[in-house]
């Protein structure tokens, strides 16, 4: 499996689904509501309800759950570090001791809470990029940030920068995979030896990768300049964004679901 197939962050999966057909602003706002609401969960047992909600949205989007969960792969080391940090260094009632290592009940609680929360955060954010094209993301973010233009905030430029950054992730992964295969075909040993040897072996990969990134950035700049791109001033859209009944229904159902999950935790807990 190539690197681009292992990591889905920033990739768009086209499909004919109710989630894909929603206005990008609806999906962005719904994702923000979900992400902020996840920080209100205090008991890891209640993440089960959030997992069911994620699975239901994935079912509606017609994107495989495996593809969505692959978006967690880039933060796997951060996930392991976060879980170990809370499990080993949270003070409380010790339930396991090994020399100077102590694992407390409160530490396991916090490790489970932070670990599952991080997985759900990345999964919901990854689902947004999987079901929304880069152009739709740019238009949606620009529209949501447009009120800030009154205070001279560059809403269009900011949205364009974020979209280009997201779009470059799959490109970087594809180029990295191509360079790795080329180096391996020449007999390069990229996985053998210790850490220092592996870092040295990756130097022939990083140098051409940086050159390709700069070349891609220059090509993009020339393409935008040749099309007389001057920013968001006077820019029109081939498909103007419009709120539909489905968008209001989706926002309402999402808000009710999030409020219901938070209320259930408070009522039971």
UniProtKB/Swiss-Prot annotation:
Coiled coil segments of this chain: none
Membrane topology value: Multi-pass membrane protein
Compartment(s) where it occurs, according to its Swiss-Prot or TrEMBL record: Cell membrane
Annotated transmembrane regions: 45-65, 75-95, 110-130, 153-173, 202-222, 244-264
Keywords associated with the record: Cell membrane, Membrane, Transmembrane, Transmembrane helix, Transport
InterPro entries: ABC/ECF_trnsptr_transmembrane, ECF_transporter_component, EcfT
A GO MF label: transmembrane transporter activity
Gene Ontology CC entries for this record: plasma membrane
Short name of one Pfam family: CbiQ
Protein's UniProt keywords contain Transmembrane: yes
Main location (coarse class): membrane
Assembly, per entry: Forms a stable energy-coupling factor (ECF) transporter complex composed of 2 membrane-embedded substrate-binding proteins (S component), 2 ATP-binding proteins (A component) and 2 transmembrane proteins (T component). May be able to interact with more than 1 S component at a time.
Function: Transmembrane (T) component of an energy-coupling factor (ECF) ABC-transporter complex. Unlike classic ABC transporters this ECF transporter provides the energy necessary to transport a number of different substrates.
Family matches, as PANTHER family: SLL0384 PROTEIN (PTHR34857:SF2)
Annotated family: Belongs to the energy-coupling factor EcfT family.
Protein name per its UniProtKB record: Energy-coupling factor transporter transmembrane protein EcfT
Organism whose genome encodes this protein: Thermanaerovibrio acidaminovorans (strain ATCC 49978 / DSM 6589 / Su883) (Selenomonas acidaminovorans)
Gene name of this polypeptide: ecfT
């Amino acid at each position: 499996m190539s690197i681009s197939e292992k990591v889905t962050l920033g990739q768009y999966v086209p499909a004919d689904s109710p989630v894909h057909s929603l206005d990008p602003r609806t999906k962005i706002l719904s994702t923000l509501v979900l992400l902020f609401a996840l920080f209100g969960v205090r008991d890891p047992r209640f993440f089960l309800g959030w997992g069911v909600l994620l699975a239901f949205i994935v079912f509606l989007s017609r994107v495989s759950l495996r593809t969505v969960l692959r978006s967690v792969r880039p933060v796997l080391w951060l996930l392991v570090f976060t879980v170990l940090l809370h499990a080993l260094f949270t003070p409380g009632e010790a339930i396991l001791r090994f020399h100077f290592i102590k694992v407390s009940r409160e530490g396991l609680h916090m490790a489970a809470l932070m670990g599952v929360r991080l997985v759900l955060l990345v999964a919901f954010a990854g689902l947004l990029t999987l079901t929304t094209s880069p152009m739709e993301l740019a238009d949606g973010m620009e529209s949501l940030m447009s009120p800030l233009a009154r205070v001279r905030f560059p809403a269009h430029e900011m949205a364009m920068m974020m979209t280009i950054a997201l779009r470059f992730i799959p490109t970087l992964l594809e180029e990295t995979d191509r360079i790795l295969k080329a180096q391996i075909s020449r007999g390069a040993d990229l996985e053998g030896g210790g850490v220092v040897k592996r870092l040295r072996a990756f130097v022939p990969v990083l140098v051409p990768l940086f050159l390709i990134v700069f070349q891609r950035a220059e090509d993009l700049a020339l393409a935008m300049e040749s099309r007389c791109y001057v920013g968001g001033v006077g820019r029109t859209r081939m498909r103007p964004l419009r709120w539909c009944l489905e968008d209001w229904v989706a926002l309402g159902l999402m808000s009710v679901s999030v409020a219901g999950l938070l209320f259930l935790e408070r009522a039971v807990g």
